[in-house]
Amino acid sequence: MKVLLIGSGGREHAMAWKFAQSPKITELLIAPGNAGTAEVGTNVDIGVDDHADIVEFAKNEKIGLVVVAPDQPIVDGLCDLLRQSGITTFGPSAAAARIEGSKIWSDDLMTKYA
């Protein structure tokens, strides 16, 4: 299976390192990646905020799974957009990520149910 991992930090490096060990993954692409991810997969020059480009790339490359790791693209709805485009995606919806993305909203929620 071809996997596209979104992100460029240490979390993504650790995930890429582990993904690369799986015999089920035939190709690992990381957008945009970093020097560490380049050692275990192929970095792709697409920014985490370029949602339309990510969807287009995933479709063109016949990606079997997209894993969205950074918080901001999740909060901005990247996982939702990928799913709406028919692409298998690992990551929460924007609605589910709201508790992480808005401290005011999460504080209000916790106060309401405290």
Language-model segments: residues:
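ATP-binding N-terminal substructure of ATP-dependent carboxylate-amine bond-forming enzymes
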Residues: 1-95, 100, 104-105
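Rossmann-like NAD(P)H-binding beta-loop-alpha module
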Residues: 85, 109-114
